[in-house]
């Protein structure tokens, strides 16, 4: 009889620096989708092909959006990934909040987490109207498509619904990266600077662990092909030596 997957891969999880308690347990959403408020998403700038559109055109259209939502409080979010390090940031006026995620997190998760940080800004602000700018189309598509398989999308939609009921009106707007939009550049710089921060403790979905397990299996197979060298006799298995030397977060 085959053991459950969680039991079957428990050894692999430990080999890549995780415990079963570090992984988010899948669960059915507590709030039915039909009770969640669908976020307002503006994809106006996505209608233009970035490769064939000069940055000045994007900046001009961005200013048009800002003029359209002139009385809205502007917030910019971004995520960054460099090597194994992952971080998220939110920027509004002269304020910045950054978080470094566990190294196994994906850039997609970082972008979503940045949007959750933005929810904290909305919650604590005295303003009631907000326009949130992000260059992550995949995050907006997941939120707009009610991708409830993602724990972060679930949390975002719950927060959005609660805040909307409390009079907080938010519009999510996609903007292209690297075209000279100041707020986006500040958020990008903040996210990259956060890569040097200590890791914030948080659980990750199993999908965030699978790539590490896959790499471990591949490295092990390559290492086993070197059975004739002396080092292999001293260290017969690869494990995740580098990961063991780093400060891996432990789930609270």
Role assignments for model-derived ranges:
Residues 1-8:
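Short, charged alpha-helical motifs in flexible N/C-terminal segments and linkers
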């Amino acid at each position: 009889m085959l053991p459950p997957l969680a039991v079957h891969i428990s050894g692999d999880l430990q080999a890549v620096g995780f415990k079963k308690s570090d992984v988010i347990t899948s669960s059915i959403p507590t709030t039915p989708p039909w009770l969640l408020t669908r976020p307002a998403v503006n994809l106006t700038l996505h209608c233009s092909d970035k490769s064939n559109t000069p940055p000045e055109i994007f900046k001009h259209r961005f200013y048009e959006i800002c003029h359209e939502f002139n009385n809205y409080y502007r917030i910019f979010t971004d995520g960054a990934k460099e090597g194994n390090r992952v971080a998220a940031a939110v920027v509004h006026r002269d304020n910045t909040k950054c978080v470094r995620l566990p190294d196994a997190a994906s850039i997609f998760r970082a972008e979503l987490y940045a949007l959750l940080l933005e929810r904290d800004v909305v919650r604590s602000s005295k303003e009631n109207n907000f326009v949130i700018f992000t260059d992550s189309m995949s995050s907006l598509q997941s939120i707009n498509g009610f991708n409830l398989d993602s724990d972060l999308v679930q949390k975002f939609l719950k927060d959005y619904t609660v805040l909307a009921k409390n009079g907080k009106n938010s519009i999510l707007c996609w903007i292209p990266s690297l075209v000279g939009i100041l707020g986006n550049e500040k958020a990008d710089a903040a996210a990259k600077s956060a890569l040097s921060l200590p890791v914030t403790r948080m659980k990750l979905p199993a999908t965030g662990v699978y790539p590490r397990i896959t790499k471990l299996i591949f490295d092990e197979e390559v290492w086993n092909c070197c059975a004739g060298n002396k080092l292999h006799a001293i260290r017969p298995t690869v494990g995740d030596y580098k990961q063991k030397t780093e400060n891996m977060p432990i789930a609270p």
